[in-house]
Amino acid sequence: MSTIEARVEVHDADILKRAREVIDDCAGLQEVGREVIAAVDLNARWRGEECINLLAPEAPTSPGVRALLSAEIGTRAAEGHIGRENRWFAGTRHIDEVESLCVELLKKVFHCEYADHRMCASMIGNAVVYSALTDVGDTIMSVAPPVGGHSSNRRDGPAGSHGLKIVDIPVDSVELEVDLDRFNRLAPEVRPKLVALGLTMALFPFPIQQMAETVSQWGGKIFFDGAHQLGLVAAGFYQDPLKEGADIVTGSAGKTFSGPQSGIILWDDPSITKAVTDAVFPIWAATHQVNRVAALAYSAAEFLEYGEAYMNQIVKNAQALGEALQERGIPMLASHKGFTRTHQVIADVRKFGGGLEVARQLESANIITNKNLLPTDSYDDWANPGGLRIGTIEVTRLGMREEEMKEIADFIARLLVQGETTEKVGRDVLRFRSSYQTLYYCFEHGLPE
C-alpha cells in the first residue's frame, strides 16, 4: 500500500507530516482536540492582535456576528426556499424568520428587488450565474488576470468548468479601466451571451452603461462580480451596477461588506428569477449554514447603521496609503489618477525582489499583504509576480484614519527602501498595533472617536 508521501498531494507535504506527528505524539484524542484549539488561539493572538492586516479580501467581523456563527441554529437543516410549503424538513418556522429577515435586509441595503443569501462563497454565486444564464459552448467575455481578472470567471474556474468559450475584455494597462473603444469593436464580433465584470485587482469603476448598450444589441447580459466592491456599492462609494445596466450582481459578504464569509446574489429582473433560484437550489445549495445566514442578517443591519461612514473611511485610507507609499519611494499603480476608488492599492515591487519575496519579508515584520500580478506580468509570473496588493478594510475597522496610513507606510518603507531588519521593524509594529484592539462600525462599539 502506498504511503501518503508517495501519493499525489496538492498540500505542503512537510506541513502535513508535522500534523501527523502532532497527532501521533498526543496521549489521546482529547489532547488532539486541545492542539486544534491551541492553533486557533495562536492565530487569534498573532493575526487578531499583533499584525497589521492589509489583505484586501479580509474583514474582521463584529462580536455579534461572531457569536451568531457559533449559535445553535447552525446545527439545523433548512433545505429549500423560505416557507413551510417549500421546505423538505419540518421545524423551520424560526429559521424562516431568520432567513426572511436576511433577504429583506439585503434588498434594503442594496436597493434591489431580489436577493439570495444561500451561497457559502461568492465564487459559488458566480457558478450559479453561469448555470442560470449560459449554456455549454456559449461565449462570454471576462477580464484576464494580469490586468485584474479573477479565476472564477476564467478557464480554470466555474466559467471554464461550465464549458464556456472565454474572450478577454480589453483593458487599458495604464489606466486600469476597460478600453471601451476596443470593447465596442470586439464584442460585436464575438457576441458574448454574458459579459463578466469581475476583478481581484479592483481599483476603478467599469463603463457598465455603455457596455450594456453594446451587448443588448444581440440580447447579451452584463454580470457584475462585486466580490471586493460589495460594501462600497451598498454605501454609495462605488457605482451601482444594477442601476447602470447590469442584469445580475454577485458579491462576497466577507470583504468590504464585513460580514461572515458568504456569497450574495442580487438582481431586479423578474424574468431571470426562476433560472437563478433553480440554480441556487437544488444545484448549488441544499442546507446552507443557517448560523451564517443569521450572522449575515445581523451584519446587514450593522451596515445600514454604520456602512456609509465605514466605507467612506476605507476609501480615504486606501488613497492616503497609496500616496504615502509613493512618497516614500515605493512605486504605486495609478498614481496619476488618485491610486484607487476602492479599498485596494497596488504596489510595483519588482525592484525590491517581487511580490512573493516582499510579502514574505513584510510577514516577518507582522505586516500581512499578498503578491499580485501586474499588467506587465505574464501568466508564467504567477509564482513570483511583480506586484503587491494592499487593502485597508481591517485597519479602518480598528479605528485608523489617514495619519495612521502614513505610519504604516513608514513601516513598509523602512523594510523595503531603507533596508532595516524585520526584527526591528516588527517590534515597532507590535507596539503600534497594541493601541488598536477595538473593532468599530458595529453595534457593540459604534463609531471611532
Q: Whereabouts are the PLM-identified features?
A:
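Flexible, glycine/charged-enriched surface loops at secondary-structure junctions
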Residues: 82-83, 287-290, 307-313, 325-337, ...
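Short, well-ordered beta-strand elements within core beta-sheets of diverse protein domains
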Residues: 54-58, 344-351, 396-397
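Short Gly/Ser/Thr- and Asp/Glu-enriched loop/turn motifs at secondary-structure junctions
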Residues: 49, 120, 291, 337-343
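PLP-dependent enzyme catalytic core of the Aspartate aminotransferase-like
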Residues: 2-11, 104, 316, 381-449
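Conserved small-domain helix->loop->beta segment predominantly found in fold-type I
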Residues: 300, 311, 315-360, 368-384, ...
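N-terminal glycine-rich, Lys/His-bearing helix-loop that initiates the first secondary-structure elements
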Residues: 1-86, 90-101, 213, 434, ...
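A common structural junction motif
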Residues: 364-369, 416
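Conserved PLP-enzyme active-site core in the AAT-like
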Residues: 6-12, 17-26, 94-97, 101-331, ...
